[in-house]
A protein has these predicted regions:
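Short aromatic-glycine-(Arg/Gly/Cys) micro-motifs in beta-strand/loop hairpins
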Residues: 4-21
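Intrinsically disordered, low-complexity segments enriched in small/polar residues
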Residues: 12-14, 28, 59
Length: 74
């Protein structure tokens, strides 16, 4: 089975956490960071189990760049 490394961006939002996989544009949430990550992993695995080969190729083939920005605060 082929494996691919993807990005998980997890941030606190209100009383919970939101997790995003930007490569696939899939998000999930949870009450803890660990739960949000686990839920995201389940969502991503579900996507790969159900999506067509064309949809997978389209999402993984899109160029995305994650970079840090430094801005001045007023």
């Amino acid at each position: 089975m082929k494996r691919v490394k993807l990005t998980a961006i997890i941030q606190k939002e209100g009383r919970g956490f939101v997790a995003l996989c930007p490569e696939l544009d899939i998000a999930s949430q949870g009450t803890s960071k660990k739960q949000a990550r686990g839920n995201l992993q389940e969502a991503v695995e579900g996507f790969f189990e159900t999506a067509s080969a064309a949809e997978i190729k389209t999402r993984l083939g899109t160029e995305r760049y994650i970079e840090n920005l430094e801005v001045r605060l007023a």
